[in-house]
Amino acid sequence: MDLPLFVIALILGIVEGLTEFLPISSTGHLIIIGDLLGYNDATSKVFKIVIQFAAILAVCWDYRERLARVAAGVGSEPAAQRFVGLLFIGFLPAAVLGLMFHSTIKSLLFNPLTVATALVVGGVLILWLERRAYHPRINAVDEMRWADALKVGFAQAAAMIPGTSRSGATILGGLVFGLSRKAAAEFSFFLSIPTMFAATVYDLYKNRDLLHMGDLPVFAIGFVASFFAAMFAVKAFIRFISNHTFIAFAWYRIVFGLVVLATWQLELVEWSEP
């Protein structure tokens, strides 16, 4: 699809912001839509890193008051120290496994067909989980134990497969391990900060040779679009899950994934293959 680069940047920025914290896989959407728009060259890798960083900052802004309290009290207040400890423990599995398998997964699995398959499988899993008996024992992040954070951390590590969804894995993992919907969603948001920040720094370092001053205007458009779209999505998502299940997201994943697989099978779209 032949669109001006600034339009592609705007589209992908909005897509990233809207999908990063929903259980539908932002990385999967960026891979599929980027492939559809023909924006999948080396520069696009850096662009996607930049717009994901914008989404991190949006969460930091939305939760700035709580994060400021934690930062102010981390040296002396047990509650703040415990909160940071929970995030550190939850971050560890993805950090360790990411360093071990990050490059292999990116080279082998970052393609539309893998994403589509993961979207469908993840959607079916969400439907199955939503039909289980649900009795939360943890109604706030502050009530979590170290073991709860570690288990959610391992769930997050599974989301290294594109199309799985980091937020989906952590939120649904939280539900399985006894967190309320709101507590699971908020811990997922907080856990995204160290996880995505570390991934951003690591990816930028590895792709530093692809950074060029001439790309800054396009990157800026995507950054701003992602930031404001993510701010909206986080607030809307918290309101939504207060009164709804994740079934709508499950069906969205299944339908979207099947459409991509069908267009590939029928040769309607020439998707990039493994």
Curated annotation (Swiss-Prot):
Its biological purpose is as follows:
Catalyzes the dephosphorylation of undecaprenyl diphosphate (UPP). Confers resistance to bacitracin.
According to its UniProt entry, one GO biological process term is: regulation of cell shape
- Species of origin reads Aromatoleum aromaticum (strain DSM 19018 / LMG 30748 / EbN1)
Q: Quote the EC number.
A: 3.6.1.27
Name any GO cellular component annotation: plasma membrane
Would you identify the family this protein belongs to, as annotated? Belongs to the UppP family.
Gene of this entry: uppP
- Transmembrane intervals: 4-24, 41-61, 83-103, 108-128, 184-204, 218-238, 246-266
Instruction: Give the domain of life.
Output: Bacteria
Give any extra note attached to this record.
Bacitracin is thought to be involved in the inhibition of peptidoglycan synthesis by sequestering undecaprenyl diphosphate, thereby reducing the pool of lipid carrier available.
Q: What is this protein called?
A: Undecaprenyl-diphosphatase
Short name of any one Pfam family annotated for the protein: BacA
Membrane topology type, per the record?
Answer: Multi-pass membrane protein
Per its record, what are the GO molecular function terms? undecaprenyl-diphosphatase activity
Q: Please list which residues make up the signal peptide.
A: none
Catalysed transformations (reactions) = di-trans,octa-cis-undecaprenyl diphosphate + H2O = di-trans,octa-cis-undecaprenyl phosphate + phosphate + H(+)
- The main location class comes to membrane
Keyword Cell inner membrane on entry: yes
Task: Give the record's keywords alphabetically.
Answer: Antibiotic resistance, Cell inner membrane, Cell membrane, Cell shape, Cell wall biogenesis/degradation, Hydrolase, Membrane, Peptidoglycan synthesis, Transmembrane, Transmembrane helix
Compartment(s): Cell inner membrane
Q: If you read the UniProt record, what top EC class would you report for this enzyme, in one word?
A: hydrolase
